[in-house]
Curated annotation (Swiss-Prot):
One of its GO terms (biological process) is ribosome biogenesis. Residues 691-718 have a biased composition (Low complexity). Its EC number is 3.6.4.13. It is an enzyme of class 3 (hydrolase). CDD domains: DEADc, GUCT_Hera, SF2_C_DEAD. Residues 1-60 form a transit peptide. The gene is RH3. Residues 652-668 have a biased composition (Gly residues). GO terms for cellular component: chloroplast; chloroplast envelope; chloroplast stroma; plastid. A motif (DEAD box) lies at residues 259-262. Disruption phenotype: Embryonic lethality when homozygous. This is DEAD-box ATP-dependent RNA helicase 3, chloroplastic.
Length: 748
């Protein structure tokens, strides 16, 4: 039976008290030595139950993620067979207070390992590392759940590297030619395998670590294995191939780690994993790390792990995102989302690294191509060769371009530090995908932002996602022109601060002359040009996001109104005030505020200016807005990911909104139209289709909505290589072509 380690609090002090009312033989499931404070990080709550008629006792250990080990505790990690304590009581509770983090320098690690960690700036353990350390050093099999981006690689890496280093003694064993691996790590993707390899190599450069995965030549991997290796990290498929080719022998493996075990199932590696485990030595230590625990993972643990200790840093809570990730959600349409995407990157990334996740490879190419006209962007997906993918990732890490558009191949295992922003271009297939996509930012305690793009008809689905993940979105409007100008100016100023003083000298005379002629206007013009705003930016609707349109807000005095407010009554009001506005009005949505009666609607910018010059009847107010108020929700009701019915694919009515170019539908009602519908039935019938496009046709936003679980993409055409590329190649620096088409690929 497995013990369980949960997470009730944040910190523990190196203190342990256990009451011992009786002295009985302890269980084989968990043995603790009480004369030495080796288990001080754990706050233990002992509960026992009898299995059938036997006397086997099953304890439950509860530990905090930030459990603390003192130096004395670390030195006393060995178990003692002399002290016994009672597990038969109903509850033996251990109280603990807050304490400080555990410093690497107090762990008595091998000097070479400690120095390597310090060079990397790793001075304290993260929660998952603290929770795993003691049982891992005891040799326990472990099942661990933790939030993404919390340092799981070093959680198993530090204790295993420590034991390998101590077993090798004077390191001569590390130099023995032809030695077989003692440490095996299985990962579901090439990217995760390479990340684990990098962590181990940087932490223990004196160990020979080899990473094996598909998509590259066998020769180099086989040669490395032949020379002798201490650690093998790889994907199950390639490891099976190497075993069958007799290049990889696992007869001396002492430590096994399955990283992201739940994803092994997702990518179809379950049979390969079980085949590998069947061929490993029975006497070994195994650790399984998984964000979720599907049936296959539980079965795997029962069959191949020996009395595993469950370390759960997520528990029953829904929230699985790392701390420090700010979540936003924004409603878009299929025709406007690419323009909005560029604006979101400008405002929220603030010049930092951004990863945009798409559902399909075609979308990744299209979005990357569209963004590249204004932002340095590259795509990453399964059709790109492994060599090209590695070069693209390295260039992204080095800042040669700032936006990476990727499919879910990049949502797990990518080692990309300092990602400031993650954007979900469509709703993900399920909550777990959302968590792991978002986990590319806010890693290792840093802050980051994630933005979810959705259509108006998917609003309730977003609410379902909030409940399933246990998170909260801040619903935002598209960035305004003012937001773009301010953010762009800030980024240009930051760029100017990086100009070398010697370069400034060459332009000082010209700058002085311009200043004398134009004053600060000269600098303002330079900032505008560098920001990409040589021409004034055009207005944009907050509802449809169409350029050249603006959004107005109409508020009426309920004391002077009759009946209910509806889209039809708004059109009637506009008809009386300015008939042209009624003919050209776009989307209309009612405001979701019981304290007022109001609506927002779209108009072409010039017509809106003319409308605002009209005299508005007393008791009503009409204004142009830059941020949307809460609107009545007319989205589909469903909590089932990927299982929406056909009716959910169209926005629902209810009078909440109407199509643009409302024609004269309501104009003939005259001023009484503003009085509203006389009854609820009339209001329902007037709603029709909730959101129409101008000209009376149905909105593309309704037919092309991305739904969770849906695999269809927008109806735009696939990108053509004949199409002009507006960015610059990050290899040669020249414009007009991508890195994949660069004629200068020497060393690429």
């Amino acid at each position: 039976m497995a013990s369980t380690v949960g997470v009730p609090s944040l910190y523990q002090v190196p203190h342990l008290e256990i009451s011992k009312p009786n002295s009985k033989k302890r269980s084989n499931c968990l043995s603790l030595s009480l004369d030495k404070p080796f288990f001080t990080p754990l706050s233990l709550v002992r509960r026992t139950r009898r299995i059938h008629s036997s006397s086997l006792l099953v304890p439950s250990a509860v530990a905090t993620p930030n459990s603390v080990l003192s130096e004395e505790a670390f030195k006393s990690l060995g178990l003692s067979d002399h002290d016994e304590y009672d597990l038969d009581g109903d509850n033996n509770n251990v109280e603990a207070d807050d304490g400080e983090e555990l410093a690497i320098s107090k762990l008595s690690l091998p000097q070479r390992l400690e120095e390597s960690l310090e060079k990397r700036g790793i001075t304290h353990l993260f929660p998952i590392q603290r929770a795993v350390l003691v049982p891992a050093l005891q040799g326990r099999d472990i099942i661990a759940r933790a939030k993404t981006g919390t340092g799981k690689t070093l959680a198993f890496g530090i204790p295993i590297i420590k034991r390998l280093t101590e077993e090798a003694g004077d390191y001569t064993a590390f130099r023995r030619s032809g030695r077989l691996p003692k440490f095996l790590v299985l990962a579901p993707t090439r990217e995760l395998a390479k990340q684990v390899e990098k962590e181990i190599k940087e932490s223990a450069p004196y160990l020979s670590t080899v990473c094996v995965y598909g998509g590259v030549s066998y020769t180099i991997q086989q040669s490395a294995l032949t020379r002798g290796v201490d650690v093998v990290v790889g994907t199950p498929g390639r490891i099976i191939d190497l075993i069958e080719g007799r290049s990889l022998k696992l007869g001396e493996v002492e430590y096994l780690v399955l990283d992201e075990a739940d994803q092994m199932l997702a990518v179809g590696f379950e049979e390969a994993v079980e085949s590998i485990l069947e061929n490993l030595p029975t006497k070994r230590q195994s650790m399984l790390f998984s964000a979720t625990m599907p049936t296959w993972v539980k079965k795997l643990a029962r069959k191949y792990l020996d009395n595993p200790l469950n370390i759960d840093l997520v528990g029953d809570q829904d929230e699985k995102l790392a701390e420090g990730i700010k979540l936003y959600a924004i409603a878009t349409t299929s025709t406007s989302k690419r323009t909005i995407l560029s604006d979101l990157i400008t405002v929220y990334a603030k010049g930092g690294k951004t990863i945009v996740f798409t559902q399909t490879k075609r979308d990744a190419d299209e979005v990357s191509l569209a963004l590249s006209n204004s932002i340095a962007t590259e795509a990453l997906h399964g059709d790109i060769s492994q060599h090209q993918r590695e070069r693209t990732l390295n260039a992204f890490r080095q800042g040669k371009f700032t936006v990476l558009v990727a499919t879910d191949v990049a949502s797990r295992g990518l080692d990309i530090p300092n990602v400031d922003l993650v954007i979900h271009y469509e709703l993900p297939n399920d909550p777990e995908t959302f968590v792991h996509r978002s986990g590319r930012t806010g890693r290792a305690g840093k802050e980051g932002s994630a933005i979810l793009m959705h259509t108006s008809s998917q609003k309730r689905t977003v609410r379902s996602l909030e409940r399933d993940v246990g998170c909260h979105f801040e619903f935002i409007s598209p960035p305004t022109v003012g937001d773009l100008l301010e953010s762009s100016a800030d980024q240009v100023v930051a760029t100017l601060n990086g100009v070398h003083p010697d370069s400034i000298k060459f332009f000082s005379a010209t700058a002085q002359k311009l200043y004398e002629e134009k004053g600060t206007d000269a600098l303002a013009a330079a900032l505008a040009h560098l920001s990409g705003f040589s021409q004034p930016p055009s207005s944009r609707s907050l509802l449809s996001h169409e350029k050249g349109w603006v959004t107005l807000q109409l508020i009426r005095d309920p004391t002077n109104a009759r009946g209910f407010l509806s889209a039809r009554s708004v059109t009637g009001f506009l008809s009386d005030l300015y008939r042209t506005a009624a003919d050209e009005v776009g989307k209309i949505f009612l405001i979701a505020d019981d304290r007022i009666q109001g609506a927002v609607f779209d108009l072409p910018e010039e017509i809106a200016k003319e409308l605002l010059e009209k005299d508005v009847p007393e008791g009503n107010s009409l204004s142009m807005i830059t941020k949307l108020p809460p609107l009545q929700d007319d989205g589909p009701s469903s909590d089932n990911y990927g299982r929406f019915s056909s009716r959910d694919r169209m926005p629902r009515g209810g009078g909440g909104s109407r199509g643009s170019r409302g024609g004269r539908g309501g104009s003939s009602r005259g001023r009484d139209s503003w009085g509203g519908d006389d009854d609820r039935g009339s209001r329902r019938s007037s709603g029709g289709g909730s959101s129409w496009s101008r000209g009376g046709s149905s909105s593309r936003g309704s037919s092309d909505d991305w739904l969770i679980g849906g695999r269809s993409s927008s109806s735009s055409r696939a990108p053509s290589r004949e199409r002009s590329f507006g960015g610059s190649c990050f290899i040669c620096g020249k414009s007009g072509h991508r890195a994949t088409d660069c004629p200068d690929k020497r060393g690429f």
